[in-house]
């Protein structure tokens, strides 16, 4: 536009210049310079009296090119004038590159048919030689617990704790025997607890515990517990919120999987480790027995043996699979850990937090069976009966559909409420009758139950059983560090696993969980006790130390005693066991 018209039409953009002005001003500016080559577009706003009853809109010739013919109301109307040409002022403007448009992922449309599922998985035929080997060893409770807190793990904790104390200019000199004593006190605190842990060492008759006081001094325990460490601070991963306990998690997962019973059915879910401090990874779960603490993803057997665990860090620190949410990605990690022992037709059960049709499809491709309750918006538009309609039908009614391409079934069942359940391995048939309490009739009635619902209810509770066992006698002693409660959780999980193996391997002489924990705590504390001024040692400690293959030496004794094995007179004894034993009987006496 000409310079005069530019004075009237100010304001510029990247591609055009727009300003509101009076029509008469614009026409006068255009008449002053006829040499303007830019194309002008003028938009005239309606006059002020456009809504009035009388207008002078017909007062001139419409074909005239001059503005004099226009009525006054139009000449004084506001206009928008746009210059579509290029001007000098556009040279300094930076053009923004166009954003790349992401291609939308087109999901395949599933075809749902009302029929029962036809799974193509093989049957379970695997045996477990490792459990048979454990049965033949007849391990004691301490031996079973030390399958997880083995010599390598104990020495690792000792080395890291001494390293951390040395970095703080403290000569701790922790030994493996002292660490086991500390573990014994932590285990004992699960079934004998005081408001203050120092009361274990008080001389007051109402609180003194001689087993703890004789095993280790109070200040020594406090010093060891305050410097307990599990990683080198100079090699921590900044992207891992649990970097200070990550080496322990890796070791425990390895031991848990190594000695896990090889079974067909597994359960996956969430567990909570109680914690009330200030930590970013702490979570709140309303309606849970443990509402506040660290959330831990857990994979267990149907009986409650913990096979694999991973503390939750959220999507910021844990990148989920692109096609799944965080929960589904954790299920895949658990399945990958299971398949390290072999690609077998495992059957995984989980609840609606994890289940989706997409997850069922991925697990099917991995050769893994899965069943779980599912939220309606994750069924990929499976055309089932409306829940309101199903509620009007009698209890036990159900509707179901199967995906034709991947043999995935979605069933909606009316029990006390309407529940959706999905599976890639179990179908509707056979439909069984189950007993339910009827509030209206005040009696129990028989309702129909599909096969996949029955199997789900029987096998899904593994994580809940583990939580129940841990909560009964969990470690009560806590420290100032944020991971002290997590360490207590790991110890409790190892005790639960050891007890589960005890129930499998020692079916003739089983003990309950409390007696199992007491046995381990007493052995660890008695083995570190100062026995110089005490009488004979307990029968329990003698049995454990006799077969540990550590520190047994044959020495001469002045007074002849009877051999503990052949019962004849001997002048030699075992230095550790303090039992008379012949040289020829020494080896046989110390082997089970």
From Swiss-Prot:
A molecular-function term among this protein's GO annotations: sequence-specific DNA binding
Region: Disordered, residue numbers: 31-69
Record protein name field: PiggyBac transposable element-derived protein 2
A Pfam family the protein falls into: DDE_Tnp_1_7
Signal sequence, start to end: none
InterPro entries, sorted: PGBD, PiggyBac_TE-derived
Organism superkingdom: Eukaryota
